[in-house]
Amino acid sequence: MLEVILNTPAQLSLPLYLPDDETFASFYPGENASLLAAVNNALYQEHGSYIYFWSREGGGRSHLLHAACAELSRQERAVGYVPLDKRAYFVPDVLEGMEQLALVCIDNIESIAGDEAWEMAVFNLYNRIQETGRALLLITGDRPPRQLNIRLPDLASRLDWGQIYKLQPLSDDEKGEALQLRARLRGFELPEDVSRFLLKRLDREMRTLFMTLDQLDHASITAQRKLTIPFVKEILGL
């Protein structure tokens, strides 16, 4: 797991553990090559910038944020990742001082719509980042900025500035290729017929498919058997 430290002016350190297999190498772009290129390019610009991208839940937006964090963390550059769907574990003050980081990732911003304290905290962070010109700010949501139902007008308008992308969903063929890519990165082969079988018999949401792939990898190692359709049926009870 990737550990990300958020350093605030109060010297508060919050370790966040992100999946170490969610990197750019494991991100299957599909029709999202332009978004992937925009994020990669922005990571190495000398001045700060802002990118917003959105997708339905499970569409890969958190994966892309985790990958960006991992990329800069390997270079020992300071990054921050704030999953707003888990804001019950934070307070808005956690955003204080984050403009000094190289990268700030705010995930699931739709979660704070109507929360006055959090909306103001994100708005103030956005302005500080613009003033310092240092950090790359990546924000994700489940819909376009104008449809977020953000009540603070100034924040709603700021979110609609900059580069905005829709993270396009993968086709079934692309999902199969994404599964095979993840398998290769883990050191095993996922036969194409097994990949097609999984897509036919399981929920096609990528998070579910990747969790199933992890389960099959473990079962294959334990039983010392290759992945075949009969073996997969046995393990998954299908």
Curated annotation (Swiss-Prot):
It comes from the Bacteria. One of its GO terms (biological process) is negative regulation of DNA-templated DNA replication initiation. Pfam families: Bac_DnaA, Hda_lid. Keywords: DNA replication, DNA replication inhibitor. The active form seems to be an ADP-bound monomer. Forms the RIDA complex (regulatory inactivation of DnaA) of ATP-DnaA, ADP-Hda and the DNA-loaded beta sliding clamp (dnaN). HAMAP family: Hda. Mediates the interaction of DNA replication initiator protein DnaA with DNA polymerase subunit beta sliding clamp (dnaN). Stimulates hydrolysis of ATP-DnaA to ADP-DnaA, rendering DnaA inactive for reinitiation, a process called regulatory inhibition of DnaA or RIDA. Belongs to the DnaA family. HdA subfamily. This is DnaA regulatory inactivator Hda.
